Design a protein with these regions (language model features):
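Conserved short "hinge" loops at termini or chain/domain junctions
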Residues: 1-79, 145-166
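Short, solvent-exposed secondary-structure capping/transition elements
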Residues: 57, 61, 96-108
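A short, terminal or domain-edge coil/loop segment
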Residues: 84-89, 113-127, 157-166
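Short, exposed interaction segments that mediate macromolecular assembly or regulatory contacts
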Residues: 65-81, 109-121, 125
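Elongated alpha-helical scaffolds
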Residues: 80-100
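Polybasic, proline/glycine-rich intrinsically disordered low-complexity segments
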Residues: 120-156, 160
């Protein structure tokens, strides 16, 4: 059975539900906002599966990149809940990585040099960066764990001299 991208979008939306900037609430019509959120989600999903597929030295048992149909917006195999959650978590990371750039640009446009001497947004940016770094670390650990387990049984693979056994 195939897995629609929508299954993963829903998990991702749960992570950013309060972010009005992602959903553009109050700015566009409901339909326009949903279309843009869907386009952004698809872009983040594609970035995320490339990241998961290419991260680290271990191979994935499945081909997230090749085994998908972008026209039908679905993977051509059934993803496990672990895989769906992992992709949604990396989507959040990719979204926040873009968000930090937007925040820095916005601060540069809002504050004059004299304002920055009185009010420094450094702490806000510092804590945002720390949280993003922690999320990256958690996601990278999750990817390593995912790749070190059998996809069907979720049992740990045993690696001896770079040979893997089930």
């Amino acid at each position: 059975m195939n897995t629609p991208y929508e299954d993963i979008y829903t998990l991702f939306y749960d992570r950013v539900i309060n972010d009005k900037r992602f959903f553009l609430t109050g700015i566009l019509s409901q339909e326009e906002a949903e279309d843009i959120a869907r386009q952004r989600s698809k872009s983040l999903l594609l970035e995320s599966i490339v990241y998961i597929q290419t991260y680290g030295t271990k191979d994935c048992e499945v081909n997230f990149i090749g085994d998908r149909d972008d026209d039908l917006e679905e993977f051509t195999f059934e993803l496990s809940l672990v895989e769906k959650q992992l992709i949604a978590d990396v989507m959040l990371q990719k979204y926040l990585e873009k968000d930090i750039t937007l925040r820095l640009n916005a601060l540069g446009q809002v504050f004059e040099d004299s304002d920055l001497k009185v009010f420094s947004p450094y702490n806000d940016i510092k804590y945002f960066n720390l949280a993003l770094t922690e999320l990256r670390t958690l996601n990278d650990t999750s990817i390593d764990r995912y790749k070190s387990r059998d996809r069907e049984s979720f049992k740990q693979k045993i690696s001896i001299f770079n040979y893997e056994f089930d």
